[in-house]
Amino acid sequence: MCALPAIESSYAVFTSHGLCGYRDPDYAPLVITLTILNAMESFLWRYIRGAGLAYGASIRNDAESEQIHFILYRAPNAAKAFSEGRKVIEALAYGTPLDDGSRVAFDETMLESAKSSLHFSIADAEGTVGAAALESFVDVRLKRMGRGRGKRLLQQASSVTLDDVQRCMQQYIMPIFDASTSVCAVSCSLSTAPSIRDALQAHGYVMNDVDMPGGASDASSDSASDSGWDA
């Protein structure tokens, strides 16, 4: 945890083990799962941003580092946003009710919408000759995937089912919200640091304070220096 005097909001990243590269059989199912979760007006948007718990909340897969991240952006209190996100993800993964007794679930409309969104994203990424050439270069030379990676992904995504999405939720998404299988990094204001630290420790995370230039220790030094100058 890094407390800074120059910010008012809090920012957090929770990281867990993800897929074993782009060739992993679960790559397409996980892409579809994340497309559903990260969609505008979808679950993370509705229960975190819509509730005023954070300006942004998303889950990102990094196949190259084999990690998956839950990212909170500009949250008044990152621990509260994390707690709410955990409840929603658990409800989606296992069918448990939310605090108000309501239930949330994936449906076929969400699944087909995610597949359509993936089609648009891939087409948009290769929308010009230059963009298509760059994508081909990255796929062939850097990712070692050969040509037509986008086309193959679309073919694989077309057969993804709701059962695949449910399995990805339990296998890849839930571990991000478990302190025994994930780590977290938080940057926040000096005033919210104690409450965020205590709340995340209650979830099982071991929180260590990190001093950075412009951090809490510098703020104390500046304050002492200013007091001496005024005197």
Q: What kind of feature is each model-predicted range?
A:
Residues 1-3, 55-60:
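Short beta-strand/turn micro-motifs at beta-sheet edges
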Residues 1-2, 115-231:
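C-terminal regions of mature proteins
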Residues 1-50, 208-231:
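His/Glu-based metal-binding/catalytic segments typifying zinc-dependent metallopeptidases
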Residues 16-18, 72-76, 187-188:
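Short beta-strand-to-loop capping motifs
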Residues 24-26, 77-83, 192-197:
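Short, conserved charged micro-motifs
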Residues 26-31, 66-72, 150-151:
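Glycine- and acidic
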Residues 39-43, 60-130, 141-146, 207-212, ...:
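M16/insulysin-pitrilysin zinc metalloprotease superfamily fold
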